[in-house]
Amino acid sequence: MATIVVQTEVNSTVEKVWEVVSNIDNEPRFWKGTKEVKTLSKEGNIIKREITIAFRDQKCLQEIQLKPKEEIKARFTKGILDGTKIIMLIPKNNNVVLKTTWDIKLSGKMNMFTAIIKNHIKSGTEQAMKSIKEEIEK
């Protein structure tokens, strides 16, 4: 498994940050590694969806758990990616620390390439966090 942690401090309220990051249908706007999202079902705070990732246009299934104003936990349930991506909102003084933690690997025979894609995922996450921060602070 590759663990990747990226965080940024956003000059805003938890409510405003949550408003932007919890709109998970908007994910491709900020996360360039996600090309397309399709919600399959929604029950309370649990969303099941199919995403198309930029890596070879692969489709993956995810189960998303929303904990309002706290975190978004995406668990990859089927496809080339195996593991989780967790986005946390951590109040800090009058700001919010937005922290993304990946615990992920490529599944099956592709597992040997996990180390290679780790830097790509980290770079994409840094760009996404920067874009989210800019959107919120504008």
Give, region by region, the residue ranges found by the protein language model.
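Beta-strand elements of well-folded, non-transmembrane domains
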Residues: V10-V14, I53-D57, L66-P68, I104-G108
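Glycine-rich portal/gate segments that line the openings of hydrophobic small-molecule binding cavities
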Residues: K38-L81, V97, Q127-K138
